[in-house]
Amino acid sequence: MMKFLTRMLSAFAVLFFAISTAQADDEVRIVIDEGVDGARPIAVVPFKTNGSVPADIAEIVTADLRNSGKFNPIPVSQMPQQPASASEVTPDAWAALGVDAIVVGQVTATGNGYNIAYQLVDTVGASGGAGAVLAQNSVTVGAKWIRYGAHTVSDEVFEKLTAIKGAFRTRIAYVVQKNGGSKPYEIRVADYDGFNQFIVNRSSQPIMSPAWSPDGKRLAYVSFENRKSQLVVQDLGSGARKVVASFQGHNGAPAFSPDGSRLAFASNKEGQLNIYVMGANGGQPTQLTSGSGNNTEPSWSPDGSSILFTSDRGGSPQVYRMSSSGGAASPVGGRGSAQISSDGKTLVMINGNNNVVKQDVTSGASEVLSTSFLGESPSLSPNGIMIIYSSTQGLGKVLQLVSADGRFKARLPGTDGQVKFPAWSPYLDKN
């Protein structure tokens, strides 16, 4: 595990910090709008520290578990004790509060970083005797990776208790339109919770619709540099940018195929706005849609066999589904911006009231997850547990986070401009 984590941190350093781009001054941070009272109670006890630590590990893990909507961490003030290891836990004291699992741990300063050790403890004996250790691990990270270390704990605890892979070591890309300046448009990347934000590219002209490659190493986006819409693919490690589509008219809404070899996009290069597919590095595109109406916002199925897209061919915008090689399309519902979960079971999209909804692929049953004003661009976490989207608040755009079960809702407001077009990264830890 330690060798693996060291390799991953080295890869992250190359991928995200060797871009030679500016660190953003103002980060988006989660502001809770609605809690998770109906979720499973859990306790994350403050970690015992040895020396000064640049971040509160327990606080980060608590926030991660809460943000998933699956857990309702109890506040420190309600904890009957604050053990640092499993041997110090009094199971009955926690079971009396309805808490069947707790996280305890220690953080120790080392010569070149911090060692984070945790134990997940069963307080009711569901997996054996009360007080049994369900999971434990320790990781050593440098100071700037302290939050990554905490998210590692969150991922492991989450997966142990839910059998779903955690996605707290992922990132989000988004566009910020700043208030003034010669280059007010920026693409930024941050941890999923808004921390460790940095600028990928800035421009005097609009930037739109960032999309991640499946390996997390590239972003495709729309740039209006040179006074025309172009599709750009940028390597996040080197910062190298390549214009892959600059056809006459509009070129927009890029989406990488699941294997990363192709890009689907929308273009009106032949007059009508249609869906096209081409190689991820550019090349001659293949037109997939035709007929009346405008077609845009392509999104691939997890296996790459089909594409969801938005079309007004029926008179008003609606989501359709077709083969990734083109052909007949069937209506799905909603109004647009559809994305399918990685297991292929759930669709997330915008409905006619501009709310974020999820829809069961098999039954067609749907549920409204957000009622915020003018919801746009929903993007699923790679495990399908959380959704980030943009909405209008006052005169500007902010990012919103909602758990896929609708229990937890929060905002990630920007402090230096409008924030829009969020895109959740794939898994970046590769475990």
Swiss-Prot record:
What is the protein's name according to its record? Answer: Tol-Pal system protein TolB
Q: Which Pfam families match?
A: PD40, TolB_N
Q: What does this protein do?
A: Part of the Tol-Pal system, which plays a role in outer membrane invagination during cell division and is important for maintaining outer membrane integrity.
Signal sequence, start to end = 1-24
One GO biological process term is:
protein import
Subcellular localization: Periplasm
Q: For this UniProt entry, what is the primary localization, expressed as one broad class? A: periplasm
Does Zinc-finger count among this protein's keywords? Answer: no
The entry sums up its family as follows:
Belongs to the TolB family.
* The protein's assembly and partners: The Tol-Pal system is composed of five core proteins: the inner membrane proteins TolA, TolQ and TolR, the periplasmic protein TolB and the outer membrane protein Pal. They form a network linking the inner and outer membranes and the peptidoglycan layer.
Question: What is the protein's species of origin?
Answer: Mannheimia succiniciproducens (strain KCTC 0769BP / MBEL55E)
Q: Where is this region: Disordered?
A: 318-340
Kindly indicate whether the keyword Cell cycle belongs to this entry. yes
User: What is a single cellular component term in the Gene Ontology annotation?
Assistant: periplasmic space
Query: Low complexity compositional bias: what residue ranges?
Result: 323-332
Query: Could you tell me the keywords of this UniProt record?
Result: Cell cycle, Cell division, Periplasm, Signal
InterPro entries per the UniProt record, alphabetical? 6-blade_b-propeller_TolB-like, PD40, Tol-Pal_TolB, TolB_N
